[in-house]
Amino acid sequence: RTGHVIAVKDVSFEVQEGETFVVMGLSGSGKSTLVRCISRLVEPTNGSVLIDRDDVIAMSERQLIELRRHRMSMVFQHFGLLPHRRVIENIGYGLEVRGMARREREDKANEVLDMVGLQGWGNHYPRELSGGMQQRVGLARALAVDPEIMLFDEPFSALDPLIRRDMQDELLNLQSVVRKTMVFITHDFLE
């Protein structure tokens, strides 16, 4: 009737600070659209997304940029790494966009690189890494900006089962250290 395809309807949830919140459902059920609505990578046609009483849907472009640069980060299913940049540059990309000096962002990127278990891989290019290692780089890039909120859109679904399990364990270990608010999207009921 409206000319729109309804991908997400009547969804309401609350995530506490430091909580890991999992959205699980079948492929095609709107999970990825939901997480993209939270970050406004997809523009919702109705409703609200509140972060500390601030409505993301009502934010101006400038406010949205600030939210994405300083309070929120996202880890994608297909890594989203920049192939022409070394691992250390991929990790520091969000800090570069913020205007952080090169030396400072490389120090931060190296710190996070160690945190995700990729010491010594900073000067390599994404094509030189396995899928699991590339996903660790994506995770490190998200952590480097020290966000309050991390959104994960099926980050491990492209990985083989053994690597997937390792990455799940790694994420749980990291969460016990960094205590970020995490929204995790998956279709895999074993995750």
Regions found by a protein language model. Name each.
Residues 85-92:
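Short coil-to-helix segment of the ABC ATPase nucleotide-binding domain corresponding to the Q-loop/switch region
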Residues 125-129, 133:
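Conserved ABC ATPase signature
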Residues 1-3, 56-73, 97, 102-106:
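ABC ATPase NBD coupling module
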Residues 1, 52-55, 92, 96, ...:
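Conserved ABC ATPase "signature" region
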Residues 144-148:
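A short, proline-enriched helix->beta-strand linker immediately N-terminal to the Walker B motif
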Residues 150-153:
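Catalytic Walker B motif of ABC-type/P-loop ATPase nucleotide-binding domains
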Residues 179-185:
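Conserved H-loop
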Residues 39:
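Helix-to-loop junction immediately C-terminal to a conserved catalytic motif
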